[in-house]
A protein has these predicted regions:
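Long, contiguous binding/interaction regions
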Residues: 2-120
Length: 120
């Protein structure tokens, strides 16, 4: 399983208030979620009028498919005409690597009372 994460800035032209910015950002995030069935959120520059930092996450069983999905999502976000996509950063994380201790370790405790080790 491959988790693909993208973080990018969206430069917003002519935005005069945080309320206006939040409305535009919410529209972009909702449309991306609906079209691509992904996780998306505003992750930075929360108090900046003219810029938003957005984060996206997708999951797939193949690295190439994950890369293509993120490319399509970023092109689509740019095509909405709300702002200019800038400063794109992408990371692909193979979940098998995390299970082998090469990623961020978990606490080993399942919040639902089970064991994470059972997932290996």
């Amino acid at each position: 399983m491959i988790v693909g994460v993208a973080r990018f800035s969206l430069r917003l032209e002519g935005v005069r208030s945080l309320k206006e910015k939040r409305g535009q950002v919410r529209t972009v995030l909702d449309r991306l979620r609906q079209r691509f069935h992904l996780s998306a959120a505003e992750v930075g520059a929360l108090d900046a009028h003219g810029r938003a930092e957005l984060g996206l996450a997708v999951v797939s069983n193949e690295r190439a498919h994950t890369e293509r999905m993120l490319q399509r999502v970023l092109r689509t976000a740019a095509s909405y005409g709300v702002g200019t996509v800038e400063d794109v950063r992408v990371e692909l994380v193979p979940m098998g690597e995390l299970a082998r201790g090469r990623g961020i370790p978990s606490s080993g405790r399942d919040p639902f009372g089970g064991s994470w080790a059972a997932l290996d």
